[in-house]
Structures are given as C-alpha cells and as structure tokens.
Regions:
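Short beta-strand elements in bilobed, periplasmic/extracellular small-molecule ligand-binding domains
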Residues: 54-74, 133, 179-197
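Short, low-complexity disordered leader/linker segments with a strong preference
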Residues: 1-29, 54-57
Length: 316
C-alpha cells in the first residue's frame, strides 16, 4: 500500500511540473520578442507582463528580447525561443508575429500591437480567428474616426499626405483603408513612404507639400518622431497620428488606444492558454474597446491648432 501511495504522489508531482511548463524550474517560460523600443510597444510589453504576473504570480518567468527594429533579429530571437522550448511566445508587432509564425506551429503564439492579422499572415477568408497555434490582440484604431478627426480639426484643408514605412504590412493596410475614407471626404491624398530610418527626414520634407500629414501606427515612424518633428514643426505642417506615442513626439492630435491595456488583455489570454483554460486555436483576435481623443498641447500651441473641448491633453 505504501508503494502505491508513493507512486501516486510521484505521478502527481510530475504532472504538476509538466503543467508549469517545460523550463525545468516548475515555471511557465514565456519568450517576448519586441520589434523595437518605443513608448507604444514598451507599454504593451509591460501590460502583458503585469497581467500574466497578476494571474500566475511566480509561476511564470519572462525572457524579453528586443530586435532593435530589424525583422531579421526577430527571426533569430524567435528561433532561440523555439530551441529553448518556451511554453508561449508573445510577439510584439507584426514582424515579430511573422517570424514566430514561420518558426513554429506547435508553441502557442500571441501577437500584440499587430494591426491586421489577415494581411500580416496572408490569411484568406478571415473570420476573426487565426486558428492553429496563433491568436492575440490588434491595435487597429477606428480609421474612419481618424479621418473624421482630420476633417474636424482642419476643415479648410484640401490635401493630406500620409507618411509611413513601406516595409511594414500593418502600415500599408492602414494607408489603403484611410485613403478611401479621406477621398470620400473630398481630400486629395498623397502617400509618402520611406523604407527605413535613413530616409525618414527627406521623405517627411516632401510630405510637407500637403496641408496636413497623417501617420498611422507605424513602428519606424514611432522610433523617429524627433526627426519628423524637426521637419514638420518649422514647416508649420500639423500631423495627426495613429497613436499617442507618435503624437507625443511630432503630432498635434490622435484618436488612440491604450497600448498598456492592449498588452494587458494579451497577458490575460496568455494565462488562459498556459493553464489550459482556453484553446488558442479557438481564441478570436481581440480589439481595444476604447479610443481617446488626445492632443499635444505644445505642438498645438506652436502651430496655432485649436481642439474641441472633448480632447484630452497627452500626459508626459
């Protein structure tokens, strides 16, 4: 009888260790690949870690890696996660998600700060669920609302230049959609794309031919707001931004989500996947429930832009 009890206890202990991941430490091992360091992605990563820590406490350990804006680095980082057999991968931004999707079809992958999963993963017949080992959250803001913001703040403007990185699939998606809305409103829309950080300033200078510039949620732009500001502010050309971080750096106004809250929601999803409460293959992509009209006080003052009373000043 004692042998039977001892065997049963041993099996329980083994099952417990297995349930807490494959790290050998009795903890779930989570690899985080963040494309680049800038306020939006930083906030999403922090929110993710905070949520998962609140749900699982010390049963989770994080390996946080930054790709320094290079998609090839995402591939290297993700391959390292796969080799170390992490229990879950959090891919922060579209290139990180694409690298993870190419590297494994068994380890659960949760994306965040990804605008459009269908275009990022080249999915047909998109129904809101990726399936397989992938799900996550989207940072897609209401592009119709952002177009309406441009019209509200600059009713006399005739031309809008859209400034973005052509190598980011999420940016191209937003450009295509908002161009349709702006054209319907009567604006003449011109896209101005840069390929990397080296030509941000020169392309921004060309975009200043427009009355207003719009910048979508774009990681390269978010990492180069100072360079953009150094061009648009002296030229007296206002920028409406797709998210708060870009607006803080070079814009006048934004209709933005909270990237911290988005990351937090992703962390809650991760907890359910790790504990077996939910199957990732059945989890639909989640979207931010709230959007906030915000403005940059300093830039608005410098450019003489007046915003309605329902806009909130950006913090920091």
């Amino acid at each position: 009888m004692k042998k039977i009890i001892a065997l049963a206890l041993a099996l329980v202990m083994l099952a417990s260790l297995a349930a807490c991941g494959g790290s050998g430490s009795g903890k779930y091992k989570v690899g985080i690949c963040q494309l680049v360091q800038h306020p939006a992605l930083d906030a999403a990563t922090q929110g993710f870690q905070d949520a998962l820590t609140k749900q699982l406490g010390d049963k989770v350990e994080f390996d946080v890696q930054n790709a320094s804006g290079e998609p090839t680095n995402c591939t290297t980082i993700i391959n390292g996660f796969v080799s170390s057999k992490v229990d879950l991968i959090m891919a922060n931004a579209t290139p990180a998600l694409q690298a993870a999707a190419s590297a494994t079809d068994t380890i659960p992958i949760l994306g965040t700060s990804v605008t459009d999963y269908a275009s990022a993963l080249e999915l047909d017949n998109w129904n809101g669920t990726v399936g397989g080992n992938i799900s996550g959250t989207s940072d897609l803001a209401p592009l119709d609302g952002q177009a309406a913001m441009i019209q509200e703040l600059f009713p006399d403007a005739k031309t809008v230049g859209i400034l973005y990185c052509s190598s980011e699939a999420n940016s191209q998606y937003q450009v295509d959609v908002i161009t349709g809305y702006l054209t319907e409103m009567g604006f003449t829309v011109t896209p101005y794309s840069f390929t990397d950080t080296n030509d941000v300033a020169s392309v921004t200078q060309k975009a200043c031919d427009s009355a207003v510039i719009y910048i979508p949620t774009d990681n390269t732009a978010a990492s180069n707001t100072e360079a953009i500001a150094n061009v648009v502010l002296p030229a007296k050309v206002p920028v409406v931004a797709g998210e708060a971080g870009i607006c803080q750096g070079c814009g006048v106004a934004t209709l933005s989500i909270s990237y911290y809250d988005l990351g937090y929601a992703t962390g809650l999803m991760a907890a359910k996947v790790l504990t077996g409460e939910a199957k990732i293959s059945e989890m639909p992509v989640q979207y931010a429930p709230e959007f906030t009209k915000q403005y940059n006080e300093a830039n608005c003052a410098a450019l003489g832009v007046t915003v309605p009373a329902d806009y909130s000043p950006l913090e920091g």
